[in-house]
Amino acid sequence: MRFTFLRSTRIFLANHQNHLSSLQNIRTIPSSSSSPVAISSVSKLSASLDHLSDVKQEHGFMVKQGIYNSLFLQNKLLQAYTKIREFDDADKLFDEMPLRNIVTWNILIHGVIQRDGDTNHRAHLGFCYLSRILFTDVSLDHVSFMGLIRLCTDSTNMKAGIQLHCLMVKQGLESSCFPSTSLVHFYGKCGLIVEARRVFEAVLDRDLVLWNALVSSYVLNGMIDEAFGLLKLMGSDKNRFRGDYFTFSSLLSACRIEQGKQIHAILFKVSYQFDIPVATALLNMYAKSNHLSDARECFESMVVRNVVSWNAMIVGFAQNGEGREAMRLFGQMLLENLQPDELTFASVLSSCAKFSAIWEIKQVQAMVTKKGSADFLSVANSLISSYSRNGNLSEALLCFHSIREPDLVSWTSVIGALASHGFAEESLQMFESMLQKLQPDKITFLEVLSACSHGGLVQEGLRCFKRMTEFYKIEAEDEHYTCLIDLLGRAGFIDEASDVLNSMPTEPSTHALAAFTGGCNIHEKRESMKWGAKKLLEIEPTKPVNYSILSNAYVSEGHWNQAALLRKRERRNCYNPKTPGCSWLGDYSI
């Protein structure tokens, strides 16, 4: 027993070589002295170190010592195989086991979660194990349900999850906190928030993890006010929970600025604002709401800042059009000897794409190459977009061709790059090449339609739109209709553009109407142009450009009085510091 105690202690204190030496020492002791607990400790060690050879050595040693038939040790060995993802060996061991208890089955079920492959395939395998359990005398416990419900959550298998819920109730586990937490996550992901709340209410002794599961479910389903209300209910619970970093991070990820400031006040009161994950969530919330000064104040107040915190600031400024400030923050981050990761590089490159910064892009690319981050798709895709938006198509193409396995974002980026530089036919050729490997999405089709519009490829654009809606069953959105209207309008097919405009499933947006009036203006279709301009004025009566479109139509027909009346109406409804028809030059030498 003394050796067993020392052996277990050394697992936590010594290095790997010392552990293996201890294993050799165990093997020199007669089998009668080798207790199952000692061998169990070595099994845990090997599993945690991911060494298959060590696990197999233990396996052989157990057989040699005649203790292989111990169910306790077999379960430990099975757990070791699953932890190092040697599932073939785990399956073989399982088939050889003469006895199995619920621990054995639970190891297999939770091992399925770690397996590679499609989530539906993993769920199917897990339910095969469940079917076999139900034909034995073994009873499922809360650990079994947690694993099985997790498989349903990952695959969004609603029917199977509901059946598990029924089985859980039948076995009297509906008030158990642990499987109920898994059920709340499952129902939340499936959008059945009423069921999630019902499961939550059935648990009498709730822990904070269960509360957090319901909060995140509300957030996931866009029910921010309800999630915020749960924070108040926590304090009235018998355990008087006040939330933790997960609670506040979930709420901050989706709340409005007013609610975010309330949470900030609570965090200050309970001294959570210095916690790195919570402080980072605060930064994100303020940045998303374009409250960059508040975000900076939070950032400056952080005692410890990690790469994630810096990334949040860089992303926040980049997304709000403050590209130069994002670059400055990146430089400051490097001065503090923090190593940027792939998200940092991708964010910085995205910020460079929003202002003329070709030199900065090249500097970042050199750093990316030096640090070996060029293989990350997010970084490579950002390089394509950055070079394209800064007018360097050749570099964008070089970046694309350097990617070993381009994903859909890579292909879409290069298709858009070619289209925006006037290479419409090459853009379509790239699209056809992509179709041999990947299935397009709505963004890909939007880039292709844009290429057709800029290149005047009417028939190709119509075929593309038809392929999207009929073959790929992708529902056209406002942007797709706008591109199609723009394509037809530019080419002079005003009646066809009008038909598309009127066939939209929703009311035409201002973008679609502007594209239509633009085409009418090019081809001098004044009546259609006036109709579109009047529609624009109905939607946006305070936008000066809409008055200009209609006014120009009146002037082109010689209706000066109507144009003058329209300009008076514009001055009454809009604040426009400029005088229409006049250009202004500032004299800054005074």
From Swiss-Prot:
Which intervals of the chain are annotated as region Type E motif? 512-588
Q: Name one GO biological process term.
A: mitochondrial mRNA modification
One GO term describing the cellular component: mitochondrion
Keyword Transmembrane part of the UniProt annotation: no
Asked if the Swiss-Prot or TrEMBL record annotates the protein with the keyword Protein biosynthesis, the reply is no
InterPro entries according to UniProt: E_motif (IPR046848), Pentatricopeptide_rpt (IPR002885), PPR_At4g14850-like_plant (IPR046960), TPR-like_helical_dom_sf (IPR011990)
The residues bearing each PPR repeat, given as ranges, are: 141-175, 176-206, 207-241, 244-266, 275-305, 306-340, 341-375, 376-406, 407-437, 441-471, 477-507
Where found? Mitochondrion
Q: According to the lineage, what is the superkingdom?
A: Eukaryota
Looking up Gene3D superfamilies in the UniProt record yields:
Tetratricopeptide repeat domain (1.25.40.10)
Keyword terms, alphabetized: Mitochondrion, Repeat, Transit peptide
> Where is the transit peptide, renumbered to this chain?
1-109
GO MF terms, alphabetically ordered: RNA binding
Similarity field = Belongs to the PPR family. PCMP-E subfamily.
The entry's protein name is Pentatricopeptide repeat-containing protein At2g46050, mitochondrial
What is the scientific name of the source organism? Arabidopsis thaliana (Mouse-ear cress)
Q: What is the lineage of its organism?
A: Eukaryota, Viridiplantae, Streptophyta, Embryophyta, Tracheophyta
